[in-house]
């Protein structure tokens, strides 16, 4: 089951678990500095996540169009806890994110900056590459749009 909450509706414990999950994946695994992860945009976003015994198993933030750096609503900070990978959870997370955007934000287009090595996941959901590969925080990315 996926939970979607606007930042202002997150409990302190939920935000702590989200921060911990993002730190483990982005800082520890991918060596991304915290300045490049947390920003004021978090306060304007919806946060979607799944839990197992109060552990974040998957997470993404949904950035409404008016706050997105793209012309569309966007999805970012997509992660799956390393102990829950290789079982389709990332695809389920993205499908639920797309459904939320379509049904609650009434948006039909979504743009994201995909880490290049997982672009096929996004392609399987209908996203198309709309840029060449570029570097973002030392990791190859490609801009994609649904």
What are these regions (language model features)?
Residues 93, 118-121:
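Conserved short alpha-helix immediately C-terminal to the canonical SAM/SAH-binding motif I
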Residues 65-75, 85, 104-108, 138-140:
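A conserved beta-turn-beta hairpin within the catalytic core of GNAT-like acetyltransferases
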Residues 1-37, 42-56:
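Short amphipathic alpha-helix that is part of the acyltransferase structural core
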Residues 94, 101-114:
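Conserved GNAT acetyl-CoA-binding A-motif
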Residues 83-85, 121-124:
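Acidic/histidine-enriched, beta-strand-rich ligand/metal-binding domains
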Residues 111-113, 123, 128-143:
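Conserved catalytic-core motifs of GNAT/GCN5-like acyltransferases
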Residues 80, 86-99:
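Conserved acetyl-CoA-binding loop-helix of GNAT-fold acetyltransferases
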Residues 49, 55-65, 72-79:
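Conserved beta-strand in the GNAT
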């Amino acid at each position: 089951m996926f939970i979607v909450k606007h930042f202002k509706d997150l409990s302190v414990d939920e935000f702590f678990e989200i921060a911990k999950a993002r730190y483990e994946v982005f800082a520890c695994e991918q060596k991304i500095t915290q300045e490049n992860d947390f920003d004021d945009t978090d306060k304007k976003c919806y946060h979607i996540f799944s839990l197992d015994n109060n552990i974040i198993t998957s997470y993404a933030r949904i950035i409404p169009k008016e706050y997105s750096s793209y012309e569309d609503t966007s999805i970012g900070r997509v992660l799956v806890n390393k102990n829950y990978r290789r079982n389709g959870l990332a695809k389920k997370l993205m499908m639920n994110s797309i459904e939320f955007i379509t049904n609650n934000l009434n948006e039909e287009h979504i743009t994201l900056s995909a880490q290049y090595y997982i672009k096929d996941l996004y392609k399987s959901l209908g996203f198309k590459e709309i840029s060449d590969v570029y570097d973002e925080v030392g990791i190859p990315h490609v801009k994609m749009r649904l």
